[in-house]
Amino acid sequence: LTGTLVQCNAEFLALSVLMQMACPGTPLIYSTLPTVADMRTGAYTPGAIETGILVIGCAQMAHYYKVPNGGYIGLTNSKVNDAQSGFETGMSTLAAVLSGVDMLNMGGLLDALLTFDFAKAMIDNEIALMLKRVKKGFDFSEENLALDVIAEVGPGGMYMDKPHTLERMRMAAFLPKIADRDPRQQWAEKGSCDAQAHAMKRV
């Protein structure tokens, strides 16, 4: 992996020199698509966790050079929009966002970039919105710390009816459109839909 990172950096530096020679001052993006092969078959594996690790390394190098960065991340080797697709996309994109990646190109791709799936694109959009929420992090302003409300409510109290909560409830937490959060009985009454079915309704 480390050698691949060296190669990525060498390619970025070479391209940067050529770009600046051709057109001085041209803005740069540290954009690479490093990946690994499955050593059992030689197959291209953009869904491998090592691809995510390489993107983290490239993001750190981009920070070192003070340029924006991004690339294809959140890809999967899964042929269908299933659990493998979800965990490969989720693991690598979360790692990338936490390492400071600026741009993700990930929408709707399956089967090592060979297939596009509309439902996967909708699910990837929801993942992207979740990642945006993660990147937003915490707001430690006096108002958001709500120390006065905590003191007022006291131990074991309820916050749901407090104006402070009501004013912020739609902004504080991400509200998904595809992920199901209903209790089981309501979920069953609505047709027991999985994420794929919910996504297809939104296509």
Residues of each region from the PLM?
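Catalytic-core signal marking the mid-to-C-terminal active-site face
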Residues: 119-203
